[in-house]
Amino acid sequence: MDKSFILNKTSPRSSARRGQLLTAHGQVETPVFCPVGSQATVKTLTPEDLKSVNVNMILSNTYHLYLRPGIPVVKEMGGLHKFMNWDGVILTDSGGYQIFSLANLRKLDEGGVSFRSHIDGSTRYITPEDAVSFQQDLGSDIAMVLDECPHSEASENEVLAAMERTHQWAKRCLAAHTLKSQHLFAIVQGGLSPVLRQQSAEYLASLDFPGYALGGLSLGEPKDITFETVRHTLRFLPENKPRYLMGVGAPEDLLEGVSCGVDIFDCVLPTRVARNGAFFSRLGRLNIRNASFATQKGPVDPECNCYTCRNYSAAYLHHLFRCEEILAYRLATIHNIAFLSNLMQEVRTSIEKDCFEEFKGDFLTRYQPTNESVRIEQKQKWLSARSGETSS
């Protein structure tokens, strides 16, 4: 496909954008949040569950599928869409971030990256050309280049080297990409340096990719730094191409990202916290394990109309989590994905009506975000845990 994006409107008082992402499996209204299905499934949900909450785009991960069941198996099954019985849009990550997360288990050179599988310890080597070939065999609608994501404490020289390697790999990925029905997105790196972020954005923009992602952010740095970097970087990317902020999914962060001019988001957060008993609501996250929910007859979120809130009391959900029943994780996940899907629909409508800033302000007046210092500590612990495994 030649055209990847239609920009319909930009807010007159911010950089919020309303558009459509054009793919071989349909049109996606933007701004959009994509649930993550790393291993060809959004954990605990069926494709029908996703459609019921108006999700038509998900992310899957090439790294996981490469290791298990293997790219040839998925290709033999007719590609990723048929393999998982999903007729919506699929974005595949190249696996660069997952390999980065392996820390001591991987080694980089100019040709590619070698790493030890977190499953069986076997040594693998992936080149940029391999990453493209794998994603073409998967048949995703949007593929990502292989990039190097420097760790959050990397030196300036290390960040520069990672950026330059990412640029060279991006050129190789672009040269190797031949599947016309698939869009290949570049990934901007550069750490938290405004100078390097500008250099990366300008260089990748000169290569004329169908879309651009911002990588290497939301890795434990303060949120104000994250979005300062996002705003700065987007100034140097083309307005007529989609912008994708990787790894961001908290409600307050989605609103801030939209106000910066981001079109696409993904994150494991809503599904991961759901399995830990955290339910999104207009007031903030609610911990269903708290004793206050043990006898609550009404739904956990009275303002929500999802399947979970229509059919089950907070007391029942509290009981399921206390007993560690599998149904608990499924019902919580349905709710959190529905919450974000509805939130993004409201965002799109508010941009159309020129009242996004009021909507954002009203939402954040009521919503209580997670404590920032606690959030950073939790993020660092999660990243450390991922050094030896990559499950989402």
Swiss-Prot record:
Keyword Transferase: yes
Cofactor: Zn(2+)
InterPro entries: ArchSynthase1/Queuine_TRR, TGT, TGT-like_sf, tRNA_ribo_trans-like
Active-site residues annotated for this sequence: 93 (proton acceptor), 266 (nucleophile)
Binding site for substrate: 93-97, 147, 189, 216
Pathway given in the UniProt record: tRNA modification; tRNA-queuosine biosynthesis
Stored SUPFAM superfamilies: tRNA-guanine transglycosylase (SSF51713)
One CC-aspect GO term: cytosol
Keywords attached to this entry: Glycosyltransferase, Metal-binding, Queuosine biosynthesis, Transferase, tRNA processing, Zinc
Residues at which Zn(2+) binds: 304, 306, 309, 335
Presence of keyword Transcription regulation: no
Stated role: Catalyzes the base-exchange of a guanine (G) residue with the queuine precursor 7-aminomethyl-7-deazaguanine (PreQ1) at position 34 (anticodon wobble position) in tRNAs with GU(N) anticodons (tRNA-Asp, -Asn, -His and -Tyr). Catalysis occurs through a double-displacement mechanism. The nucleophile active site attacks the C1' of nucleotide 34 to detach the guanine base from the RNA, forming a covalent enzyme-RNA intermediate. The proton acceptor active site deprotonates the incoming PreQ1, allowing a nucleophilic attack on the C1' of the ribose to form the product.
The protein's name: Queuine tRNA-ribosyltransferase
Taxonomic path: Bacteria, Bacillati, Chloroflexota, Dehalococcoidia, Dehalococcoidales
